[in-house]
Amino acid sequence: MSVMFDPDTAIYPFPPKPTPLSIDEKAYYREKIKRLLKERNAVMVAHYYTDPEIQQLAEETGGCISDSLEMARFGAKHPASTLLVAGVRFMGETAKILSPEKTILMPTLQAECSLDLGCPVEEFNAFCDAHPDRTVVVYANTSAAVKARADWVVTSSIAVELIDHLDSLGEKIIWAPDKHLGRYVQKQTGGDILCWQGACIVHDEFKTQALTRLQEEYPDAAILVHPESPQAIVDMADAVGSTSQLIAAAKTLPHQRLIVATDRGIFYKMQQAVPDKELLEAPTAGEGATCRSCAHCPWMAMNDLQAIAEALEQEGSNHEVHVDERLRERALVPLNRMLDFAATLRG
């Protein structure tokens, strides 16, 4: 079947980088945010890919730094009446779907995700309609509208286990939106998977030849790879996994030097986990080429201290996440299935 929208050829305009803050400005906004969090009965929920100073602030204020699955769990269970989600838009939507009674704020509602942008709901609905015999599994990196069409939502940390489970039931799968993660899961499980053709603009840029040269330069290094990366990069890995799984692998691998193929925002928590190990960025620019993302999501970078302070101070349409109630109820069903399934895996 042909699909009118082609994620492979889509070019997403990057947002402007936030204006760098001085040391004094950073100190001012840090103290202001801490005060506003207390006044608003709010807690910060930050993704591993946000900048280190944002993750540090979340730690210092009793918040959460995690992958998207744990962000969802933490936000739903925390008693705070307001969640400040430092991440990208779908993460704020997911928080609102799971916690409709809470106020969900984001530093900016313009923080997108190329996987989300690469899966427009109208085209995706048509794709699903053309394959009515397939169970629809969508990655967490999708809009509320796409989640509402799905049977299951999944994160990379439990993707293999879920598809293995569905395959054991004889179910055929539509997987969206990440083609690389879909192919990785298919290879691991042998499941019958029909993939949407989206990709993460960060992980899609990792280059095999450049990584090979870096490996030759550091032959004692282990390679850690997120499965949103191209198959050729995954094939070079000593460990493959979600952000939380890569941090765990960094601790268990005996190597003292690690080449990391995911967004460099992860280095903050990974270095905490292995303070005695050297972390190297996997290359995103090939021979004679330049990188666009350069191993850091440009939309994650929009979560700066000034924007967080403004979100807590101003609230309003520029910062508060809203999800249509009927859409929220439909999207909640596959999200709850994911959380229930994840709970069974934890025993």
Curated annotation (Swiss-Prot):
Record's keyword terms, sorted: 4Fe-4S, Cytoplasm, Iron, Iron-sulfur, Metal-binding, Pyridine nucleotide biosynthesis, Transferase
Enzyme superclass (EC): transferase
GO cellular component: cytosol
Listed transmembrane segments: none
Residues at which [4Fe-4S] cluster binds: 113, 200, 297
Catalytic reactions of this protein: iminosuccinate + dihydroxyacetone phosphate = quinolinate + phosphate + 2 H2O + H(+)
PANTHER family for this protein: QUINOLINATE SYNTHASE, CHLOROPLASTIC, QUINOLINATE SYNTHETASE A
Protein name: Quinolinate synthase
